[in-house]
Swiss-Prot record:
The protein, known as: Rhamnulose-1-phosphate aldolase
InterPro entries cross-referenced by the UniProt entry: Aldolase_class_II_sugar_metab (IPR050197), Aldolase_II/adducin_N (IPR001303), Aldolase_II/adducin_N_sf (IPR036409), Rhamnulose-1-P_Aldolase (IPR013447)
Essential cofactor(s): Zn(2+)
Gene3D superfamilies linked to this entry: Class II aldolase/adducin N-terminal domain
This enzyme's EC code(s): 4.1.2.19
Length: 274
């Protein structure tokens, strides 16, 4: 029998959650991670599935995700513990044929359930599927320290925040030319914040929740982790620069344009115009 804990997707989730914990982005049960799979990914592991999978209805139907499997982190679970007991802290779920709910096929033992941010994840998956023609498969939410810190001192405006991050590190414009979406502060774990996040995900692969954390999307676990890591590194640089009295020189608008041309990306116009 094939052991699902040795599958590429369980091992990938273990690595991503462990790395995020070691970065200091996911204290206690902070953060959540979902990866969209294909039936072929889970086909070898049916013998590992629960004999009577639990069914959980969604708060709103998502027909775009019908019959789609995901691997998800659990509600109230600590990222630091995923590596110790994957079956207790992760779960493979599959949305039903009409997108009204999902079955827990594997993991989430002892009656555990998926992350409370599942509405935000699933809604964001829907938008990123449309925005990237199905290329994006990962949604990651974490409490990246310096990005959170900047939401207290920068104007919480997409153009302003994006431009500052682009100037904080040369690679940022290349990695996220579409900029960073920003929400107003909202209560987490609700359909409302999920809908607002998904709306920003139509235009941006990164979305900030002020005073809380960040959502990132990408085609793989590595790409999504790297996206957030890149933005967080720039935020760390900016926090240090501001604490030293602010910028005396920076990357100019003309240099940002040249950077975009060199790497074949189109920078967010509103950020470039500042």
């Amino acid at each position: 029998m094939q052991n699902i804990t040795q599958s590429w997707f369980v091992q990938g989730m273990i690595k991503a959650t462990t790395d995020a914990w070691l970065k200091g982005w996911d204290e206690r049960n902070g953060g959540n991670l979902t990866l969209r799979l294909d039936d072929a990914d889970i086909a070898l592991y049916h013998d590992n599935f629960h004999p009577q999978p639990r069914y959980i209805p969604l708060s709103q139907p998502m027909p775009l995700l019908a019959n789609t499997p995901f691997i998800v982190t659990g509600s109230g679970k600590f990222f630091r513990n995923v590596q110790l007991d994957p079956a207790a802290n992760l779960g493979v779920v599959k949305v039903d044929s009409d997108g009204a709910g999902y079955h827990i096929l594997w993991g989430l033992t002892n009656e555990a359930v998926p992350t409370s941010e599942l509405p935000a994840h699933f809604l964001s998956h829907c938008e990123r599927i449309k925005a990237t023609n199905g290329k994006d498969r990962v949604i990651m939410h974490c409490h990246a320290t310096n990005l959170i810190a900047l939401t207290y001192v920068l104007e919480n405006d997409t153009a302003v925040f994006t431009r500052q991050l682009w100037e904080g590190s040369t690679e940022c414009l290349v990695v996220f030319p579409d900029g960073v979406g920003i929400l107003p502060w909202m209560v987490p774990g609700t359909d409302e914040i999920g809908q607002a996040t998904a709306q920003e995900m139509q235009k941006h692969s990164l979305v900030l929740w002020p005073f809380h954390g960040v959502f990132g999307s990408g085609p793989t676990l590595d790409e999504t982790f790297g996206l957030i890591d890149t933005a967080e590194k720039s935020a760390e640089v900016l926090v240090k620069v501001y604490s030293m009295g602010g910028m005396k020189q920076t990357i100019s608008r003309e240099e940002l344009i040249a950077l975009g041309q060199r790497f074949g990306v189109t920078p967010l116009a509103s950020a470039l115009a500042l």
